[in-house]
Regions:
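Domain-level signal for soluble alpha/beta catalytic cores
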Residues: 1-205
Length: 205
């Protein structure tokens, strides 16, 4: 038995924090091309900050074809809906398949983690979070602030979205401990968390 499992990130294939409305076949090809390359080197795929049930379904089925389980990372807005307008429960009930090993709220503020946990608990699946520390609760899609051409330097997200300075490593620990006490078994940090935050919560395992 391994003490450490390696996750392979399958992120949103068009833009971050935004539903991908492209043709399903195009999305599937993008996911498959990436998954095929990294698949041999990972234990499972992490569906990394996905904004609609359709994308989750496509990526889950790609992983199934490659015989890999998936940790599903749903991005949520302040209203606890995905950017597509779907609820967590709707996506779970419609698209869950046998290779889902867990469900997390992905790249969301600690406040959104807390407000969405009551719905996730009811789904009877291992759950948790990867919390961000952006300066705003609802980060905007990258393409809205980064319009650089391939030969230009793009806008730094730290400048466009800002960074919270009110969540110390100790506060991140306290927040994570509270979520763990509510049943979460998957704890992590996302954008703008740093090694100090992760070191602090590592004692919660």
């Amino acid at each position: 038995k391994k003490d450490i499992l390696i996750a392979g990130s399958l992120p949103a294939q068009d833009d971050t924090y935004l539903e991908d409305k492209r043709n399903s076949k195009l999305i599937e090809k993008d996911f498959y091309d990436q998954a095929k390359i990294i698949g041999p080197y990972v234990d499972f795929f992490y569906l990394d900050v996905i904004s609609s049930g359709r994308e989750i379904d496509i990526a889950s089925n790609v992983a199934l074809k490659l015989s890999k389980p998936v940790l599903v990372g749903m991005h949520l807005k302040k209203n606890n809906l995905l950017p597509s307008g779907e609820t967590i429960s709707e996506v779970f009930q419609k698209y869950k398949n046998n290779n889902w090993i867990g469900l997390i709220s992905a790249c969301v503020s600690p406040e959104i983690v807390e407000s969405s946990i009551s719905e996730i608990i009811k789904l009877n699946i291992p759950f948790g979070f990867k919390a961000n520390l952006w300066g705003i609760d609802e980060p905007t899609p990258v393409k809205t602030f980064n319009t650089a051409k391939p030969n230009e330097i793009g806008t730094n997200p730290n400048i466009a979205l800002g960074k919270r300075n009110d969540i110390s490593a100790k506060k991140f620990y306290d927040f994570s401990k509270k979520i763990k006490e509510n049943g979460a078994t998957i704890l992590g940090g996302c954008c703008e968390t740093n090694p100090n935050h992760i070191r602090e919560i590592s004692s919660l395992k």
